[in-house]
UniProtKB/Swiss-Prot annotation:
It comes from Lactobacillus helveticus. Its EC number is 5.1.3.3. Pathway: Carbohydrate metabolism; hexose metabolism. This is Aldose 1-epimerase. GO terms for molecular function: aldose 1-epimerase activity; carbohydrate binding. InterPro entries: Aldose_1/G6P_1-epimerase, Gal_mutarotase_sf_dom, GH-type_carb-bd. It holds the Pfam family Aldose_epim. Keywords: Carbohydrate metabolism, Isomerase. Belongs to the aldose epimerase family. GO terms for biological process: galactose catabolic process via UDP-galactose, Leloir pathway; glucose metabolic process.
């Protein structure tokens, strides 16, 4: 198992990185910290998912390929939810509703921490408010 990362640019003073996870059987997964985007899943050098040509292309295209759904998967009616007696208002981004975590998580630069062990390779991505 192996992890590495390559810097390919900057946004808002932060490095844009392609994180590479590899196993011992020829599988390679590439994730971008730009939008926590699943960029490629390679098996024997064949990409198993639809991808753009380069990491930099993801900041130019708004097609959501490999995109991570925000903190909420699905639609929240009128962007409101209740926790106990308190009502919370979320940003509206789908008519009068909130959908898939709100506006812009796909264009944020996420913090990342790759790690590996004898049996696994992983990356943790975090987006702080």
């Amino acid at each position: 198992m192996k992890t590495s990362f390559n810097k390919y640019g900057r946004k808002d003073g932060k490095d844009l990185c392609e994180i590479v996870l590899e196993n011992d059987h020829g599988m390679i997964v590439k994730v971008l910290n730009y939008g926590a985007t699943l960029e490629k899943v390679l098996l024997n050098d064949e990409n198993m998912i639809l991808s753009l040509n380069s990491p930099a292309d993801y900041s130019q295209e708004r097609n959501y390929l490999g995109g991570t759904v925000g903190r909420i998967a699905g639609r929240v009616r009128k962007g409101q939810w209740r926790h106990g007696l308190e009502t919370h208002q979320l940003p509206i981004n789908d008519g009068e509703n909130h959908i898939h975590g709100g506006i812009g998580t796909d264009t944020e630069v996420w913090d990342f921490k790759p790690s590996c062990s004898e049996n696994s390779a992983r990356v943790d991505l975090t987006l702080l408010d």
